[in-house]
């Protein structure tokens, strides 16, 4: 599990290789990842946007930006958590992802929180990147 804490908001990530949706013969590798966001602060916050940088084993990067996560812009009161699962394909047997969420506090302040860099490794991978 990978973990980052920004302004008392914890983000954990658990990636999993999905062999049923992968094919080494077609250079298609797929991972799911489960993210848990926990608000340990004293103020209610809302996740507004996401920004991902996805890097494959050759160093090729893909940038993904968008509103919310999995179609939601969750609001987390102090002590609350939000969990979701999504997925990512790569054309190489390994890679990694890193990112940030833009949050807004109940007072209207916008700020970013880190998503920890996490490794995407398949059984076909000969070395671990992160």
Curated annotation (Swiss-Prot):
<protein>
    <recommendedName>
        <fullName>Protein ApaG</fullName>
    </recommendedName>
</protein>
<dbReference type="InterPro" id="IPR023065">
    <property type="entry name" value="Uncharacterised_ApaG"/>
</dbReference>
<dbReference type="Pfam" id="PF04379">
    <property type="entry name" value="DUF525"/>
</dbReference>
<feature type="domain" description="ApaG">
    <location>
        <begin position="3"/>
        <end position="127"/>
    </location>
</feature>
<dbReference type="InterPro" id="IPR036767">
    <property type="entry name" value="ApaG_sf"/>
</dbReference>
<dbReference type="InterPro" id="IPR007474">
    <property type="entry name" value="ApaG_domain"/>
</dbReference>
<dbReference type="GO" id="GO:0070987">
    <property type="term" value="P:error-free translesion synthesis"/>
</dbReference>
